[in-house]
Amino acid sequence: MFSKFFDNLGPLPHHIHHRDQHAARVGESGKPEMYFFPAQQNNHNGEFAYTFFGLNEDVSKEEVKEALKNFTKGDNELLSMAKSYKLTLDTGWDVPPGVLHAPGSLCTYEPQFASDVYAMYQSVLFGHHTVTEDLLWKNTPKEEIGNFDYLVDVIDWEKNVDPEFHKHRFMAPKPVRPIEEMEKEGFIEEWICYKCPTVCAKTPDDFARSYGYDSRQRRLWLYHYPGAWKMQRLEH
């Protein structure tokens, strides 16, 4: 496990991280990840503070396949098949492997599994930046290159077209104990990433005690589970 901050001027392409069964074919592991947008790191929203997730419920696999076939013919219009969400500071999203996502331009704290598998399914970005075709086939087994059905199979279809995607994937901070109880002790500790079965993150009480609590200065603590809780890395 590891965590990072990414802070892009504009949005990233609608892309995907492979699930275990597809990643294993190229000797890798699947990559779950989560996002959190800390207010203290975002004095500027960048060019596009919206993120696209998944696909519209009425989109068919054939439509996605056709868009992927048009990757080298200009804008393949994949984003027209997806929903965008305005990003809200001090909230986050769960992004399971197999879910298409085009991250927006807020500075983002990202706890994730230590894997680098991905493929870019969108050909032309905001600002007319283009994506090269080799990234469409990134981490595809050699024998599957050119097989657009394989690219569609990489998509976790049920999760992408989930009509309750926001309900299942959006994460608002959750106090670990009653707020009144923690305020009496001079700090507030919150879970900020908690819907992934592999990795989670919270604001740590010991650092809040040491530095003094300030709701605008969350410090981020990464854990790995199941099993015993284990601290992996601190970002501040």
Predicted features along the sequence, with ranges:
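Active-site region of the double-stranded beta-helix
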Residues: 1-89, 99-236
